[in-house]
Amino acid sequence: MRIDILTLFPEMFQGPFNHSILKRAQENNLLQIDTINIRDFSQNKHHTVDDTPYGGGAGMVMGPEPLFECFDHLKAKNAGQVGRVIMMCPQGEPFTQEYAKELAREENLVIVCGHYEGIDERVREVLVTDEISIGDYVLTGGELPAMVVVDAVARMIPGVLGETASAEEDSFYNGLLEHPHFTKPREYRGYEVPEILLSGHHGNIRKWRRRQSLLRTLERRPELLKDVELSKEDKKVLLELQNLLLSLNLKQMK
C-alpha cells in the first residue's frame, strides 16, 4: 500500500513513522508513506497557502490552488492513479475499526491534512472521496488524526503484524473489547496471574478470554454488543454476566 499525506508540516511525521511497526512495514515493502509539503505547490513567491474567507469571519482558509496543483503532481507521478482521498475534519464520518479494515484493502490512499479555519469547499467537492473524524473535538490541524488513521490502517495490512491473530485479538477488531493480558512474574506484590492462564489447556484459556472480552464490553461499552455477531454460547455467558453484575449492584445499594 502507498499512502500520500498532504500537509503543511511534513516534519511532524518523521518520528511516528520511523519507529516500531510502521518502520518495519516500510522496511519490508508492505507500506510506502510519502509526505508532501503543500507549500511546495503554492503559486506565489511567499509560498502562502491561505487567505481571508469570502463573506468575512475569523481565521484563514486554505486555498484551492496549491491542493489542486498537488493532486496534478500526484496523478502525473502515479500514472493518473491516486486512490481514495481522505480529508481529516471534525465533521467527517467517525473513524472505526471497520473503517480501518475497509481502507486497508485499498492499494493507494491520499490523506489531506487541513489547517487554519478550514479548506476551500471546492477541494472537498472535487477532490475528496472520504471525510474522517477521529472524535468530537477540534485539533489544531489534521496531522495528528492522519497519524491515527495511518497506524490503524497499517495494522490491518496482511503481514504487517507478523501474525494475523495478533490483529484479530485487538479491541474492536471483532466488535468486542480485548481480554486482559498477563506476563511474568507469576506473582508480583501479592497480585497473581489467573490460574487458568497457567493451566496449558488452550480450550479453557480461549473460553476464559472470550468471557473476559464479553465482560469488559458489557461493563465499559455495552452499546457495542448490539452490532456483534454472538454465538449461542456467547449469549448464554452474557446472560450470566448480566445477572452477576445486577446482583453485585443490588448488594452495593443495600
Swiss-Prot record:
One of the Pfam families matching this protein, by short name: tRNA_m1G_MT
Protein's UniProt keywords contain DNA-binding: no
Binding sites annotated in the UniProt record for S-adenosyl-L-methionine: 114, 134-139
Record keyword Transmembrane helix present: no
Biological process annotations from GO: tRNA N1-guanine methylation
Keywords: Cytoplasm, Methyltransferase, S-adenosyl-L-methionine, Transferase, tRNA processing
InterPro entries: Alpha/beta_knot_MTases (IPR029028), tRNA_m1G_MeTrfase_C_sf (IPR023148), tRNA_m1G_MeTrfase_TrmD (IPR002649), tRNA_m1G_MTases_N (IPR029026), tRNA_MeTrfase_TRMD/TRM10 (IPR016009)
UniProt enzyme class: transferase
GO CC entries: cytosol
Places the protein is found: Cytoplasm
GO molecular function: tRNA (guanine(37)-N1)-methyltransferase activity
Reaction(s) the record says it catalyses: guanosine(37) in tRNA + S-adenosyl-L-methionine = N(1)-methylguanosine(37) in tRNA + S-adenosyl-L-homocysteine + H(+)
Chief subcellular location: cytoplasm
EC number(s) stated in the UniProt entry for this protein: 2.1.1.228
Entry's family note: Belongs to the RNA methyltransferase TrmD family.
PANTHER family xref list: TRNA (GUANINE-N(1)-)-METHYLTRANSFERASE
Physiological role: Specifically methylates guanosine-37 in various tRNAs.
Quaternary assembly: Homodimer.
Protein name: tRNA (guanine-N(1)-)-methyltransferase
